[in-house]
C-alpha cells in the first residue's frame, strides 16, 4: 500500500514538470496567434513571457514559507482551482490586460507545483536514487515541450482557436488533482519541519545556488542565439538551423533518461565535474566549428552531456542537509529561474554591441565558471568528510 502511494506521489512530481514545460512552450508557440487575436504586434506581445516568468519566480520564492503554513495536498488542490479560473479567464479574455493577469496566475500555479514536485522527490528518495528520480522528473519537462507543440500545430492547422490549447494544458493539472486526492502526503507534515536547516547556509549551498544561476543563464543564452548565429555567421539555412536546435533538445531529453540510470553507479560530485567540464569543451568546439556536420554532432553531444547538470545541482544541494529542506530546494529553483529571467536582459545588449559570436563565448565562459565551481564544491566536500 505504501509502495502504491509512493508511485502516486512520484507521478504527481512527473506531471508537475510536464505542466510547467507545456505552459512555457505553448505560450511561445502561439505568440503570433495571440497577437493577431488582440490586434497587437508580436513585439508588443513579448511581455507575456515577463508575466509568466515573474509568476513562476515569485511563487517559488513564496512557497519556501507557504509550505510551512499550508499542507502540500491543500496547495495542489488550490492550484487546480486556480488553474481552472486562469484557463477560463484566458478563454474569455477580452483584453490583453486580462490575458496577462491570467497567464501570471498560471505562472504562480506552475512555480508552486514544480517546487512541490521537486520537494516530493527529494523526500521520497535519497542518495544516487534521488538524483536518478529527479532526472526522470526533469525529462517530463522536455517531453511535454515536445508533445504540446505537435498538439498546438494540429489544433491551429484545423483553424481551432489558440485558447483551446490551454484547455488541453488543464488536463495535466486535472491528473495531478486526481492523484492528489487519492494520495497520502506524509512528507507535508514531517519533512517541512526541517526547513530551519537552511539558516545554517554552508559555502557549498551558496556555490550550488550560483552554479544553478550561471548554468541556466549560460544554457539559455547559448541555445537562444544559436539560430541567429548559424544563419547569419555560418550562413546555414533556417531549416537546418531548426534541426540543430531540435537535435539539442532531443539529445537533452535522451541524456536525462540515460543519466537517470548511469548516475546510480557514480559519485555525484565527480559526475558534476565531468559533465560541466565536457559541456564546456563541447560548447567551445561548437563555437569554433564551421561545417554543418560538425555543428550537428557537437550540439547533439552538448545536449546529451549537459542534460544532467541542473538536476545534479539540485540533488547535491538537497544532500547538504541531514533531511530534505523545502526552503533549500526552492532556493536552487529560485536562482535557476533568475538565470532564465536574466537571459535576454544580459545577452541582448551584448548582441547589439559586440555581436552573436561574443554572446556565445559569454555562454561558454559561464559554463567554464560552473566547472571551476564544481571543483571547489568537490574540494570543500572532501574537507568536510575528513573533519
UniProtKB/Swiss-Prot annotation:
Tagged with keyword Transmembrane helix: yes
One Pfam family linked to the record: MFS_1
Cellular component GO terms, alphabetical = plasma membrane
GO molecular-function terms, A-Z = transmembrane transporter activity
| Membrane-crossing segments per the record | 11-31, 47-67, 76-96, 101-121, 134-154, 160-180, 205-225, 243-263, 271-291, 299-319, 331-351, 358-378
Xref: InterPro entries: MFS, MFS_dom, MFS_trans_sf, MFS_TsgA, MFS_TsgA-like
Annotated S-S bridges: none
Tell me if Flavoprotein is a UniProt keyword of this record: no
Q: Where is the signal peptide?
A: none
Q: Which UniProt keywords apply?
A: Cell membrane, Membrane, Transmembrane, Transmembrane helix
Predominant localisation class = membrane
Compartments annotated for it: namely: Cell membrane
Q: Give the record's membrane topology.
A: Multi-pass membrane protein
Instruction: Write down the PANTHER family for this protein, in alphabetical order.
Output: L-FUCOSE-PROTON SYMPORTER, PROTEIN TSGA
Q: Which family does it belong to?
A: Belongs to the major facilitator superfamily. TsgA family.
Q: What's this protein's name?
A: Protein TsgA homolog
- Which species does the entry assign this protein to? Buchnera aphidicola subsp. Schizaphis graminum (strain Sg)
- What's the gene? tsgA
Amino acid at each position: 500500500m505504501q509502495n502504491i502511494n509512493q508511485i502516486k506521489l512520484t507521478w504527481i512530481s512527473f506531471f508537475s514538470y510536464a505542466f510547467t514545460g507545456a505552459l512555457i512552450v505553448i505560450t511561445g508557440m502561439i505568440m503570433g496567434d495571440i497577437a493577431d487575436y488582440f490586434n497587437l504586434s508580436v513585439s508588443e506581445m513579448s511581455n507575456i513571457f515577463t508575466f509568466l516568468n515573474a509568476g513562476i519566480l515569485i511563487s517559488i520564492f513564496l512557497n519556501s514559507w507557504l509550505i510551512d503554513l499550508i499542507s502540500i495536498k491543500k496547495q495542489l488542490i488550490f492550484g487546480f482551482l486556480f488553474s481552472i479560473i486562469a484557463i477560463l479567464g484566458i478563454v474569455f479574455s477580452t483584453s490583453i490586460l486580462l490575458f496577462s493577469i491570467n497567464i501570471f496566475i498560471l505562472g504562480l500555479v506552475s512555480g508552486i507545483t514544480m517546487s512541490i514536485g521537486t520537494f516530493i522527490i527529494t523526500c521520497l528518495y535519497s542518495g544516487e536514487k534521488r538524483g536518478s528520480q529527479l532526472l526522470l522528473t526533469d525529462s517530463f519537462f522536455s517531453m511535454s515541450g515536445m508533445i504540446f507543440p505537435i498538439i498546438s500545430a494540429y489544433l491551429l492547422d484545423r483553424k481551432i482557436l489558440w485558447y483551446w490549447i490551454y484547455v488541453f494544458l488543464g488536463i495535466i493539472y486535472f491528473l495531478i488533482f486526481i492523484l492528489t486526492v487519492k494520495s497520502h502526503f506524509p512528507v507535508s507534515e514531517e519533512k517541512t519541519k526541517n526547513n530551519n536547516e537552511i539558516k545554517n547556509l554552508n559555502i557549498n549551498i551558496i556555490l550550488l545556488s550560483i552554479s544553478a544561476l550561471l548554468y541556466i543563464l549560460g544554457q539559455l543564452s547559448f541555445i537562444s542565439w544559436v539560430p541567429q548565429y548559424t544563419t547569419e555567421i555560418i550562413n546555414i539555412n533556417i531549416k537546418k538551423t531548426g534541426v540543430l536546435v531540435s537535435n539539442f533538445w532531443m539529445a537533452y531529453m535522451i541524456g536525462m533518461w540515460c543519466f537517470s540510470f548511469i548516475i546510480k553507479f557514480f559519485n555525484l560530485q565527480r559526475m558534476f565535474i565531468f559533465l560541466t567540464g565536457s559541456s564546456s569543451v563541447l560548447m567551445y568546439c561548437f563555437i569554433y566549428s564551421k561545417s554543418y556536420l560538425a555543428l550537428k554532432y557537437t550540439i547533439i553531444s552538448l545536449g546529451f552531456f549537459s542534460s544532467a547538470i541542473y538536476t545534479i545541482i539540485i540533488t547535491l544541494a538537497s544532500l547538504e542537509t541531514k533531511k530534505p529542506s523545502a526552503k533549500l530546494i526552492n532556493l536552487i529553483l529560485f536562482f535557476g529561474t533568475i538565470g532564465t529571467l536574466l537571459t535576454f536582459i544580459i545577452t541582448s545588449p551584448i548582441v547589439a554591441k559586440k555581436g552573436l559570436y561574443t554572446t556565445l563565448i559569454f555562454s561558454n565562459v559561464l559554463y567554464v565558471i560552473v566547472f571551476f565551481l564544481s571543483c571547489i564544491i568537490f574540494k570543500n566536500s572532501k574537507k568536510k568528510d575528513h573533519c
